[in-house]
Amino acid sequence: MSSSQPHRVLREIISTKQNEIKKISAWDPLPHRGLSLRDSLKSRTFSIIAECKRKSPSAGELRADYRPVQIAKTYEELGASAISVLTDQNYFGGSLEDLKDVSSELKIPVLRKDFILDEIQIREARAFGASAILLIVRILTPEQIKSFLKLASSLGMDCLVEVHTSDEAKLALDCGAEIIGINTRDLDTFQIHQNLVEEVSAFLPPNIVKVGESGIKKRSDLDTFRKLVDAALIGTYFMEKQDIRKAWLNLF
């Protein structure tokens, strides 16, 4: 992949998402489940947010036999504190129906993972059963982050605010983020930089729930995260394995 390719892909994702937003219509919201991502992650010494996704721009198709409800139930049985569900269709093969189906079947918080650019997507997430949403600092203005945090809170949802640098982490803190995800995958290059977790987590105060994202491939990776953050979000590792239960046990 050329150095310019990742930049182009990210721009394409944002452009596609902006066009999707224009087509969002009304919906009948699911009952509010009253589940808190923050509380769930803080209830254990170290927590796992396990992810459901069919494919990704960096890895291509991850799971041909993709059954998100079945996968999510397996995660819950294994001890996940929360579930992340990709709802982007074009680049990750997800859907809002996946979010709705998973939220309806589980008793733990479910995070809508998507490229949130507009308030209507937050209301949409709530309508389809999400307990939390992902906000990516790199693609939002400070004003948007503050506004989206406030709106999500008013709807009874938490926000996982994703950062990639210490500067982005400072911005997230200034905007009022309480759960900060440190993504070791650079969105501009799609490369993994594990040292980012140590660098950025050291910058965050103890009252912030810290989540390490991306790059978990083996037990030693997870052990590193345990020393630095409160939780890990793991997706590709599980999705690439035919036997999720065995993959989980191999990590722990």
Curated annotation (Swiss-Prot):
Reaction equation(s) it catalyzes: 1-(2-carboxyphenylamino)-1-deoxy-D-ribulose 5-phosphate + H(+) = (1S,2R)-1-C-(indol-3-yl)glycerol 3-phosphate + CO2 + H2O
Key words of the record: Amino-acid biosynthesis, Aromatic amino acid biosynthesis, Decarboxylase, Lyase, Tryptophan biosynthesis
EC number: 4.1.1.48
Entry's Gene Ontology BP terms: L-tryptophan biosynthetic process
MF terms in GO: indole-3-glycerol-phosphate synthase activity; phosphoribosylanthranilate isomerase activity
Pathway recorded for this protein: Amino-acid biosynthesis; L-tryptophan biosynthesis; L-tryptophan from chorismate: step 4/5
Keyword presence, Lyase: yes
Pfam families on file: IGPS
Entry's family note: Belongs to the TrpC family.
NCBIfam families: PRK00278.2-4, PRK13957.1
Name of the protein in question: Indole-3-glycerol phosphate synthase
Source organism of the structure: Leptospira interrogans serogroup Icterohaemorrhagiae serovar Lai (strain 56601)
